[in-house]
From Swiss-Prot:
Gene giving rise to this polypeptide: PBA1
Name of the protein in question: Proteasome chaperone 1
Region forming the signal peptide: none
Annotated Pfam families: POC1
Species this chain originates from: Saccharomyces cerevisiae (strain ATCC 204508 / S288c) (Baker's yeast)
Taxonomic lineage of the native organism: Eukaryota, Fungi, Dikarya, Ascomycota, Saccharomycotina
Superkingdom of the organism of origin: Eukaryota
Primary location group: cytoplasm
Subunit note: Component of the 20S proteasome chaperone. Forms a heterodimer with ADD66 that binds to proteasome precursors.
A GO CC term attached to the entry: cytoplasm
Length: 276
């Protein structure tokens, strides 16, 4: 039997001696993490309940009916620095721009590092004795690291005063509505929760502030984070449970929630159409 050497990828015929642009050639590099600014003047002890949810659940909290009041916002910033290029060890005997027109000549690069700042802010609302944290998820423009750091900041602040915590979210990896507490998990493998709500539950269950009492309501959905679609039956269950947990008037509250959900087109089948 003859064994012949072969490669998955063909080797190039010509190898160019390109100068090293980066000092660190390893795959793992130390990267910055977002900084979260929590409102300093927020008086958390005066609230007995804290609701943590995402923007897709905003129809559950009608502004006019509940008289929502904006009391601050959570700001998060991420500063990314472009490292300065290393100094060249010698002069080239050829023209750099001619051989590498799309590359940057290290000899002509300034020593100063460029900084790029990414920032997002999310409002905090209140109604009665309840705080409302509503995080906007968008897998296109907002990295998951922002949600992870925001959830850590929120739970660490609430852990100092231990209010009743209610978490409301969605997941496309569950088959039916799930109600969970600190002592009971109704998820059945391979069901799981991701995104901002998954990060919040992680902080409540295994994070530094674990042990807090909470109730969690997760509805099945379709679509990526930030663009979820819910069924009308699941919306009815959400409205009933939220109205029961928060003590809202059933008839008027449910009517307003359904109206807002249809306006936001968050319901599967709320707006029927035909793809052409």
């Amino acid at each position: 039997m003859l064994f012949k050497q072969w490669n998955d990828l063909p080797e190039p015929k010509h190898l160019l001696d390109l100068p090293e642009i980066s000092k660190n050639l390893q795959s793992l590099e130390v990267c910055p993490v977002p900084k979260v600014e929590f409102p300093q003047d927020l008086d958390v002890p005066q609230y007995s309940t804290a609701v943590i949810t995402t923007k897709i659940m905003n129809p559950l909290f009608p502004k006019n009916l509940l008289q929502l009041t904006s009391i601050g916002e959570i700001k998060t910033t991420l500063t990314v620095k472009s490292p300065s290029l290393p100094q060249s060890s010698g002069k080239h005997s050829w023209n750099y721009d001619e051989n590498f027109p799309n590359e940057v000549d290290p000899d002509q690069k300034n020593d100063t590092a460029d900084e790029t700042v990414y920032g997002f802010s999310f409002p905090i609302y209140s109604f009665g004795k309840t705080l409302l944290f509503s995080m906007e998820e968008n897998f296109i423009s907002i990295s998951p690291i922002f949600g992870n750091m925001i959830s850590r900041s929120i739970i660490s602040q609430l852990a100092q005063f231990s209010p009743d915590i209610i978490v409301i979210g969605t997941s496309d990896k569950i088959a039916s509505m799930k109600v969970m507490t600190e002592n009971e998990c109704t998820l059945q493998p391979p069901e799981f929760i991701t995104g901002f709500i998954g990060s919040v539950l992680t902080q409540l269950i295994v994070g530094p502030s674990k042990g807090l009492k909470f109730k969690c309501l997760v509805a099945p959905s379709e679509g990526p984070n930030g663009f979820e679609k819910l069924s009308l039956s699941d919306m009815g269950s959400l409205v009933d449970l939220c109205g029961q947990w928060l003590g809202f008037e059933p008839s008027r509250y449910s009517e307003e929630c359904y109206r807002l959900w249809r306006c936001d087109s968050a319901a599967i089948g709320a707006q029927s159409g035909l793809y052409i």
